[in-house]
């Protein structure tokens, strides 16, 4: 790109910055509520972008609607699913139909790969739809390559089979816990991550272990022991004052803590 008299200097700089951003590892929160979305919001969904590749992590209720504020459904390159609870996959069906309709309108879309585990054969089978999407089973014991991303997995403690993910690209690492109560294996799995996207379904005085979830104290201790650079609390409860979750987590973790918010973006 070259600066010309027809292009203002500021527009030139802006376009350079946009081009450079494509080479950063960028995380954008699409939805973050646990269980179900609040009014005009979404449950679990996170967009990762790097080198022009767009990967959606989980696709819960409301995610497709919110995603269209950033990109269109046909612009996705892949989807990666942690497990098959509705608050993480509810919008898979409408994503499939969106791409189907775009095809009817003359837009040529390649088959979209939907990566998921095959420990639930019925749910996994629904990931394949006509020539629109193709379910691809990941092997949790192996590193998965999706576009520019290298993904490793850790089975979580949750009522159904569920996998946490460590997603790496160009020396940067984001760990997404998905749904789980705390387990010691998380520490090494998350060691020195740039971002820990940690579920926080309960307040510090509540015990979420039997439900397969963490509370704010669990998240803080986890982040401190793993020596992560930044903790993002997500999968948030629908009651109480959620700002208290930061205060409670900060009693254990001395680093940066933020609550997940709609369209919140972090570039690494």
In which residue ranges do the predicted regions lie?
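Cap/insert and terminal regions of metallo-dependent hydrolase folds
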Residues: 182-265
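Catalytic core of the metallo-beta-lactamase
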Residues: 136-192
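Active-site metal-binding motif and surrounding structural segment of the metallo-beta-lactamase
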Residues: 62-111
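Metal-dependent catalytic neighborhoods of phosphoester/phosphodiester hydrolases
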Residues: 91-99, 126, 241-249
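Conserved beta-strand hairpin/beta-sheet module of binuclear metal-dependent hydrolase folds
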Residues: 20-71, 162-178, 195
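Polybasic, lysine-rich low-complexity intrinsically disordered segments
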Residues: 6-8, 15
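Short internal beta-strands
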Residues: 110-119, 232-233
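Active-site neighborhood of phospho(di)ester-bond hydrolases with catalytic His/Asp-centered motifs
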Residues: 56-60, 77-83, 87, 175-180, ...
